[in-house]
Amino acid sequence: SDKAKEMGASTKFTAGESADALSYMALAGWNTQSMLEGISPVLNLAAAANMDLAQASDIVTDYLTAFGLKASDTTHFVDIMAYAMAHSNTDVIQLGEAYKACASTATSLGYSVEETTAVLATMANAGVKGGEAGTALNAIFTRLATNTKKCGDELANYGVNIYDAQGNMQSLSSILTGIAGVWGDLTDQEQANLAKTIAGTNQYSKLQTIMAGCSEAAAEGGQSFSDYTEALNNCAGSADKMAGTMLDNMNGRLVLMQSAADGLKIAIGEDLPPA
């Protein structure tokens, strides 16, 4: 397509790679206008992450849908992933693996992509990432939803409320920030009991690891879950900035020149009369 050729001539990716990325958007049911608007931010994400363009497109289209977002949300979604990649020990592929395990449940419970990603990024900094992180977080989601009274009563014992003044459940980031705030004051046994109540017997050790990491980060002035969520709500331009940084060196400029040359070859080839 003309858009694929345009992207091939002006970015590090070839026209063929751009066409592959567009094909994933088509498979996701995007219309032509959405594809034309969505390809540039996906290109930025792939360049920022130094990853395969088609794979980036596949991840974006899959998990936009899982989080109940639309094609028009593509730019914000890729900025969220780019910000998380830049500010935590994870990458786009690992985020995709984590989303696969927990995004649908998060959406069904009303948790946003921002707070879900904030928790996953914090988990990654504690060494829990990818599908392992997504599975653990999915267990926490499920326990909070199906074992609400027991979780609420247990947390209330330590001064953490899962409901606001109007009786509505607090956001995930608020609940986890509250737990992290009291975690360091609990005995080992109290920590284990609380973790089992919230995450279940199969995943409680992951929650212990996460909270230990959060307590350490808080002691060093790091971001809380709520702070990270707020940052992700205001991360516009992250993917574009990271892509520019990745390509702003001699190797990046050579890649762009090669891509432009490939685009020129296509254009010349199309203008030549048939033999």
Language-model segments: what does each one mean?
Residues T75-M85, E216, E230, G237, ...:
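Surface-exposed amphipathic alpha-helical segments in non-transmembrane regions
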Residues G152-V160:
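Acidic, Ser/Thr-rich peripheral helices and adjacent loops at domain boundaries
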Residues G96, G127-T135, M169, L176, ...:
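Hydrophobic, low-dielectric interface segments
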Residues E190-Y204, G221, L272:
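Glycine-centered helix-coil hinge/cap
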Residues E114-A121:
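EAAAR-patterned alpha-helical heptad-repeat segments
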Residues K100-A103, A136-R143, G159-N161, K196:
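A glycine-rich phosphate-binding loop feature that marks nucleotide/adenosyl-phosphate handling sites
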Residues S1-H76, Y83-L95, A106-E114, A126-G134, ...:
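A short, structural motif
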